[in-house]
Design a protein with these regions (language model features):
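Single conserved hydrophobic/aromatic residue that forms the stacking wall/gate
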Residues: 163-172
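Structural signal for conserved beta-strand scaffold positions within catalytic alpha/beta enzyme cores
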Residues: 17-19, 116, 143-145, 164
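Short glycine/proline- and charge-enriched loop/turn segments
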Residues: 159-161
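Alpha-helix initiation/capping motif
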Residues: 7-8, 30, 34, 87, ...
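P-loop/Walker-type NTP enzyme "switch/lid" segment
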Residues: 1-50, 105, 109, 154-157
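Hydrophobic pocket-lining residues within nucleotide cofactor-binding pockets
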Residues: 22-24, 31, 119, 146, ...
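Conserved catalytic-core segment of NTP-binding enzymes
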Residues: 49-144, 150
Length: 172
């Protein structure tokens, strides 16, 4: 009954990764027409719980059926934001969707925290946005940030994990 059989790759000892692929993209199309579509990931993950201590689901920056499935299957969500206007509106939308999934479908997901991406500590605007996030969201904003780095785009372009990027400087 699974939309597609998606096979994880072993990345490091005790770490498997299910990279983005055309099969994964096609899954969303199939999921949209499947009854009980919001619960598909939950069912798959229940079958994997004994194999893994933790399962991390990296979602696209959308609130489509894959993200909804991830929220329904998860205990916690960590929300990345680059701090721009649309990302801030996206945080409002994800709060709304989480509330809706809780009320309508019994989701148990809780927000663990937020972190900034594309962050440049030397740029006043980024520092101001981060301070604004902390004012709005409080202690749930992680100290950890993902800096603005060309290596991130290069790894995505080369379809490889940043950790396995061809350039050693990209792994710093």
């Amino acid at each position: 009954d699974r939309p597609l059989e998606l096979k994880p790759l072993t990345w490091l000892d005790r770490v498997d990764v299910l990279p983005a692929s055309l099969d994964l993209a096609a899954t969303e199309v199939i999921m949209n027409t499947t009854p009980g579509r919001e619960f598909l990931f939950r069912e798959i993950i229940r079958g994997l719980e004994k194999k893994y201590d933790h399962i991390l689901i990296d979602c696209p920056p959308s609130l489509g059926i894959i993200t909804q499935n991830a929220l329904m299957a998860s205990d916690f969500v960590i929300i990345p934001t680059d701090g721009n206007y649309f990302a801030m509106k996206g945080i409002e939308k994800i709060h709304y969707i989480i509330g809706l999934l809780r009320r309508k479908l019994g989701a148990e997901v809780r927000i663990l925290g937020y972190f900034m991406t594309k962050y440049n500590a030397g740029r006043k605007l980024d520092v101001d946005i981060r301070e604004s996030l902390i004012e709005t969201l409080g202690e749930s904003v992680f100290e950890t940030t993902i800096r603005n780095n060309v290596a991130l785009g290069e790894a995505q372009y080369n379809a490889c994990l940043l950790y396995t990027s061809p350039s050693p400087r990209d792994r710093s």
